[in-house]
Amino acid sequence: MNKWLLTLSGTIFIGTLLLSSSAEAQRTEMVDVESIGSIITATYDAISGSAGEARDWDRFSNLFAEGATLSYVTRDEDGSYSRTIRTPSGYIESSGASLERNGFFENEIHQVVESYGMIAHIFSTYESRRRESDTEPFARGINSFQLMNDGNRWWVVSIYWQSEGAENPIPSRYLSR
């Protein structure tokens, strides 16, 4: 009988730990998606980190709606522009190892939010650095976020970005704080 009670109490204790750990993870995830500001911040945080630092790709993936895309504009050799499209898992597959190996910090320096009902569009000007302590960014550009709120939380539907270049400097209206 004592052995049975000991086993039962151990099972209950472990179950309680697992449930509280799961509840804590859910609370943490909800903090990331409870507002427009929090989901934008979480997106930047999830991809940023020092060289050799693993990213929390589960956190990153949890930000995106089913069918979400990440797209960017590139200039081709002939001078034309094209768009490359990735899913969140495709982005992790194509860029994750490089971000972790080389270090990458992306910070928002300006934001314009337009929203209506349960949708929002955010123009988010960013600066990218290899180390958090770098004084000058190696790249800047604009991330165009499209978000949806399902009544419970915000979801990233798409991120579409273009890096700044000599032929397309960022307009001052997207740089002021």
Predicted regions and their residues:
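Bacterial N-terminal signal peptides that target proteins for export
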Residues: M1-T11
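C-terminal segment of classical bacterial N-terminal signal peptides
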Residues: I14-S22
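Short, low-complexity N-terminal intrinsically disordered segments enriched in polar/charged residues
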Residues: A23-N62, S176-R177
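Hydrophobic pocket/interface hotspot
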Residues: T43, F60, A68, I122, ...
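N-terminal, post-signal-peptide region of Sec/Tat-exported proteins
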Residues: A51-G79
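Surface-exposed, charged secondary-structure patches
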Residues: L70, T74, S80-S133
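Short, surface-exposed coil-to-beta transition loops
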Residues: F105-E108, P137-S144
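Short beta-strand edge/turn micro-motifs at domain boundaries
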Residues: R140-P169
